[in-house]
Amino acid sequence: QFTIDILKRDLEEEKIKTDNLVVIKPHRNINFKENSIFPVSLSHSVPDTVGYVLNTQDGAIFYTGNFVFDPTMNYPFKTDIGKLAYIGKQGVLCLMAESRYASKIGYTSPQHRINKVISEVLYKYEKRILFNVFDGQIYRIQEIFNEIMHTDRKVIIMGKRLESIINDAIDKNYIHFDKTRFSNIHNAKDENVIILISDEREKPFSNLDRIIKRYDKFITLNETDTVVFASSVYPGMEKTATKIYDNISRIGCNLIILPTDKYLALHASSEDLMLMIDLIKPKYYFPVIGEYRDQVANMKVAKEAGINEENVLLKLNGQVVTFIDGKLVESKEIISSDDIFIDGKTAGDVGELVIKDREILSENGVVIVSVTLNKATKQIVAGPEIYTRGFVFVKENIDLIKEAEKKALEIINENTKPNFIDFNKVRLGIRDTLGKYFYDETECKPMILLVNGEVE
């Protein structure tokens, strides 16, 4: 239900019909002709998380998704171990289990709990505290709320999406918190308020980055603030996160980053996987999710759990696994699994270089160096002048722009002879020299373009 509520809200914002959304319930079969799917409750950061048993004429396949075993977790985060044991007794052909934490020793629980460190933060820092979380990690948000309830502080939720998700979760008893403790965003300047800031996975730290750059009209960070990163950084986002950490430190805020080796996300560690294998007793084991090295670690866990090495399937994206009459059949079929980029009315024909250029433009902007030359003598008639879009605000960075124009002029003069100019060297020189200069001054790498014109 929780997932459907979020999906429905997002679809309605895009004016997409939501008539065909169906809420599935754990432990009730979903039938598709001769096949069926049986959802079973598992513990994760999202309420009502389920794994799926796909019952086919060739055997049952169980896909875990993300999970942990934690006997202290209650509804709607509780794993139904009895149902897992029942599924195992019925016979499972293949278990597809997540791999992200397979190399970690022991169980994930209780290392996923952050209540103690949150309590310490609330006790130590009496001024304004900002918690950065991911809006889908409801269990972690509940942990933060649990500790806030021991204080007299008010809570502000930044962002309509996060506010809507939390209010709906409270109304449906997914989150337990007193709504009278919520305050309005207009009170964000109060010095002892607590602010929850959330970012979507596709746009990590976007809201916090806007605050750091002083684009937000309600919140301005200062030296007395404390910023807590209460969610693990998703793989591939480490560089972005590091930049955010540095920018917060430059402001002088208290910066608290929960170490990922001490405070784990809700993913199965090696003992969680061992227990799942023991309950399900699969004939074949298929490590999924995570990097390839994680899947290799998961394969080793399965072998230690007693599964024959030839029955552990380690595959690359696109490779096909085929079972016929309960037996693994060799398949050389490959399914294309590369990213497909949709560009306007076309799909799949956008090259990597185009995508890279767009990433640079979106993250660092563009700098255009414009110069006009005499067509005959190649002498400069006007410029060079620099224009920027999405890089810096020119009026506040006049010295930066003037120095860049000076460097561009030097490069043009160095590569100009009577009646001749080497535009290739000029372009490369301007790109390299200004690129280094801008990075040294701003830590940004904008796209740099030379636009030259000639007049009689």
Model regions: which residues?
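His/Asp/Glu-rich metal-coordinating catalytic cores
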Residues: 1-187, 206-220, 239-242
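C-terminal regulatory/interaction regions
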Residues: 146, 150, 168-456
